[in-house]
């Protein structure tokens, strides 16, 4: 049975932890508002750029002049999975859910005899994947020193990915991130970014004349589109991280409150039992006299 001192120390420790989780919840809530606004602002641009490029690409006949980012290598043997996770933990199942989606895709591809490699953005995903797939991670991009996430960060990642593609290191690149829906809902999402794939527009499309030629426009814009899609994914991930962290810290704060109540009840009962025992001893001693 724990002593009163042990129980007091335990209660004080949980109260200190509760203060930390409450503070982290408030910080995450403040950062979430900014991150959510950034993610929601990036969505229309990324979707519109994808749509415009899709319209241009629909009128292109694949040939030797077609940009490789659109035509691809013509193979489907080597896959690069671009995995975006967080640099820090204490965010519930945020990273685990993304890695689970990555594992499902990787195991499916490996089962089909494909060569699978990983390009990690964020240390948490890297730490899990390097244990699961040793020797298959080609690069880690660490963003811990980045205070304000900007397009330049996505552009740098895109350049590295495209450079590896041009060197023939992979045939297909799929981007994994967490799509932010709400504070309690973040959906792991997979998006193929190389070679570019576009959804077909519904209904008849207008006919345009382009200057310069479509292939030249695509050659200029497809690399930028890779960066734009990665930037959108990073912003979605950032909002998802803070939403998940806020929920996790809120749950931790509530659990700490429940634990404090439970330990306080045990403390009061133990103290009452000790007082009762002392009274019995005093009365017994008086009767003996």
UniProtKB/Swiss-Prot annotation:
Task: Report the record's Gene Ontology biological process terms.
Answer: proton motive force-driven plasma membrane ATP synthesis
Q: What PANTHER family has UniProt attached to this entry? A: ATP SYNTHASE GAMMA CHAIN, ATP SYNTHASE SUBUNIT GAMMA, MITOCHONDRIAL
Q: What is this protein called?
A: ATP synthase gamma chain
Q: Which GO terms describe its molecular function?
A: ATP binding; proton-transporting ATP synthase activity, rotational mechanism
Is the Ion transport keyword given for this protein? Answer: yes
Indicate where this protein is primarily found. Answer: membrane
Provide the Gene Ontology terms for cellular component: plasma membrane; proton-transporting ATP synthase complex
SUPFAM superfamilies tied to this protein? ATP synthase (F1-ATPase), gamma subunit (SSF52943)
Protein's organism: Azorhizobium caulinodans (strain ATCC 43989 / DSM 5975 / JCM 20966 / LMG 6465 / NBRC 14845 / NCIMB 13405 / ORS 571)
Per the entry, what this protein does is: Produces ATP from ADP in the presence of a proton gradient across the membrane. The gamma chain is believed to be important in regulating ATPase activity and the flow of protons through the CF(0) complex.
Assembly and interactions? F-type ATPases have 2 components, CF(1) - the catalytic core - and CF(0) - the membrane proton channel. CF(1) has five subunits: alpha(3), beta(3), gamma(1), delta(1), epsilon(1). CF(0) has three main subunits: a, b and c.
Family, similarity comment: Belongs to the ATPase gamma chain family.
């Amino acid at each position: 049975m724990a002593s009163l001192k042990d129980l007091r120390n335990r209660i004080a420790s949980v109260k200190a932890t509760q203060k930390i989780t409450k503070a982290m919840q408030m910080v995450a809530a403040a950062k979430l508002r900014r991150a959510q606004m950034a993610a929601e602002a990036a969505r229309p641009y990324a979707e519109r750029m994808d749509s415009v490029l899709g319209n241009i690409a629909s009128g292109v006949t694949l040939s030797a002049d077609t940009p490789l980012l659109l035509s691809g290598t013509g193979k489907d043997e080597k896959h690069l999975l671009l995995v975006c996770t967080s640099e820090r933990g204490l965010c519930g199942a945020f990273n685990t859910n993304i890695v689970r989606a990555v594992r499902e895709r990787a195991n499916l591809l490996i089962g089909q005899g494909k060569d699978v490699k990983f390009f990690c953005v964020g240390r948490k995903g890297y730490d899990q994947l390097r244990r699961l797939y040793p020797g298959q991670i080609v690069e880690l991009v660490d963003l811990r020193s980045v205070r304000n996430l900007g397009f330049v960060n996505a552009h740098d990642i895109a350049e590295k990915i495209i450079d590896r593609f041009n060197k023939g290191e992979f045939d297909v690149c799929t981007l994994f991130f967490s799509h932010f829906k709400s504070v309690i809902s973040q959906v792991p999402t997979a998006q193929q970014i190389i070679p570019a794939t576009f959804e077909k527009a519904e209904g008849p499309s207008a006919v345009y004349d382009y200057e310069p030629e479509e292939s030249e426009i695509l050659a200029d814009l497809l690399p930028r589109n890779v960066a734009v899609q990665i930037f959108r994914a990073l912003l979605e991930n950032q909002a998802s991280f803070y939403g998940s962290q806020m929920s996790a810290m809120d749950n931790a704060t509530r659990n700490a409150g429940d634990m404090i109540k439970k330990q306080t009840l045990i403390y009061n009962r133990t103290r009452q039992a000790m007082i009762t025992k002392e009274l019995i001893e005093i009365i017994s001693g008086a009767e003996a006299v």
